[in-house]
From Swiss-Prot:
It catalyses: tRNA(Pro) + L-proline + ATP = L-prolyl-tRNA(Pro) + AMP + diphosphate. It is an enzyme of class 6 (ligase). This is Proline--tRNA ligase. One of its GO terms (cellular component) is cytosol. The lineage of its organism: Bacteria, Pseudomonadati, Pseudomonadota, Alphaproteobacteria, Rickettsiales. Belongs to the class-II aminoacyl-tRNA synthetase family. ProS type 2 subfamily. Keywords: Aminoacyl-tRNA synthetase, ATP-binding, Cytoplasm, Ligase, Nucleotide-binding, Protein biosynthesis. It comes from Rickettsia canadensis (strain McKiel).
């Protein structure tokens, strides 16, 4: 992509309305623009990141055998009345009436609707298990939306719902999804800790939240120090990880620790995923019954699995930034490489830049080629801000000798590279980052 053709409205100054780092950087880098309180338009750069995260989440769900569906944003209120949640959910639910006086709502979650779909289409234990998921925009009328997309009113979620014949099988499915979540966050290039948590208004009696460690997090987490080993060695078996202690502040009890207090550490975290074993709460209330192997009607056992995709964008920034801007993990970066031509009027600079752009694009490497006619300092500031993992910097002096500068955005290390060796180096770096995005 040529920067001269791209829509990238970067801001030089910090927006006064932004309180946290991710909100500031998302506005400054031209990822989003606010349309109303807690409601944002995603501009091209932000949308690319959102789609990259969405595709990684989708890929891992598909690998786990889940099947994608798409439920509507707008839901009939009668389903929520039937499940018993309509009056209890509170003012966060946006309700309205259509021209026929039917009460509708903008869905904040989908347990009620997916239960309705299940009960009308699956009747026998032979059709189980099933795991259905969708990726859809949701709305919660937050009383005080803040922190940009971290706590907005409109947000993109991946929600999955599993159905099993009994509790034993439901817990097996839950454990499989626990592993899927660990693998998903690995692939996203983030370090997420699974903590024991409350089920909240969803219901049920088994629950884990997944938190990205960040100083700006709202939650305090207490966890086994071995999680730090996991961060440095992501190949540790998931079964081993599942046995390690980790709890939210609400669930942490120093009098009931399975390990010594000296083996525990604490950090602030940002919740980006939550999984629940619900049991039969919705199936009983909504009469979602199946014939078991003895011909007896029994309520189906359910679990729910959510990942906040738009929230993840902000959380990843909070955990991956410096004073200059964002440092994207390679897996979610909108562009893997920023190609910076410092002098578009110098024929040698342009020759090397166009050669690099052509060679890398031929390898399906996403490159943002800065072919704009602005001063070098402005170019450096823009590309450090938007956070491509690697930068190729081409200036007249070194270009005369077929040399370019190669910068690792995360480490800040810059080295001189012969133009003929550039493609091989970048492909090697991207492979290494893919194997360990931390």
């Amino acid at each position: 992509m040529l920067l001269s053709k791209y829509f990238l409205p970067v801001l030089k100054e910090e927006p006064s309305e932004a309180q946290i780092t991710s909100h500031k950087l998302m506005l400054r880098s031209g990822m989003i623009r606010q349309q109303a309180a807690g409601i944002y338009t995603w501009l091209p750069l932000g949308l690319k990141i959102l789609k990259n995260i969405e595709n990684i989440v989708r890929s891992n769900m598909n690998k786990a055998g889940a099947l994608e569906v798409l439920m509507p944003c707008i839901q009939p209120a009668h389903l929520w009345m039937e499940s018993g949640r309509f009056e209890n959910y509170g003012k966060e639910m946006l309700k309205f009436q259509d021209r026929h006086d039917n009460t509708l709502l903008f869905g904040p979650t989908n347990e009620d609707m997916i239960t309705d779909i299940f009960r009308h289409n699956i009747k026998s234990y032979k059709d189980l298990p099933k795991n259905l998921y969708h990726i859809q925009w949701k709305f919660r009328d937050e009383i005080r939306p803040r922190f940009g997309v971290m706590r907005g009113r409109e947000f993109l979620m991946k929600d999955a719902y599993s159905f099993d014949i009994n509790e034993e099988n439901a817990v097996k499915t839950y454990n499989q999804m626990f592993k899927t979540y660990i693998n998903t966050f690995r692939d996203l290039g983030v370090f997420a800790i699974p903590v024991i948590a409350d089920n909240g208004p969803i219901g049920g009696n088994l629950s884990n939240e997944f938190h990205i460690i960040a100083e700006t997090g709202e939650s305090t987490l207490y966890y086994d120090k071995r999680f730090k080993i996991f961060k440095d060695n992501p190949d540790i078996d998931v079964e081993e990880i599942k046995s390690w202690y980790a709890a939210s502040e609400e669930k942490h009890d120093v009098n009931k620790l399975p390990i010594s207090e000296q083996e525990i550490t604490s950090s602030k975290g940002i919740e980006v995923g939550h999984i629940f074993y619900i049991g039969s709460k919705y199936s009983v209330n909504m009469n979602a019954l199946i014939n078991d192997e003895h011909g007896k009607l029994t309520p189906v056992e359910m679990s729910s699995y959510g990942i906040g995709i738009s929230r993840l964008v902000a959380a990843i920034i909070e955990a991956n930034c410096d004073e200059k801007g964002i440092i994207w993990p390679s897996s979610v970066a909108p562009f893997k490489v920023s190609l910076i031509n410092l002098n578009i009027h110098d024929s040698k600079c342009t020759e090397l830049a166009e050669r690099a752009y052509k060679e890398l694009s031929a390898q399906n490497i996403e490159v943002l080629y800065d072919d704009t006619d602005v001063r070098p300092g402005s170019k450096f500031a823009t590309h450090d801000l938007i956070g491509s993992p690697y930068q190729i910097i081409i200036g007249p002096k070194k270009a005369a000798n077929n040399i370019v500068e190669f910068k690792n955005r995360k480490s800040g290390v810059i080295e001189d590279i012969k133009i003929g060796n550039l493609k091989k180096l970048i492909m090697s770096c991207l492979r290494q980052q893919k194997s360990c995005n931390f």
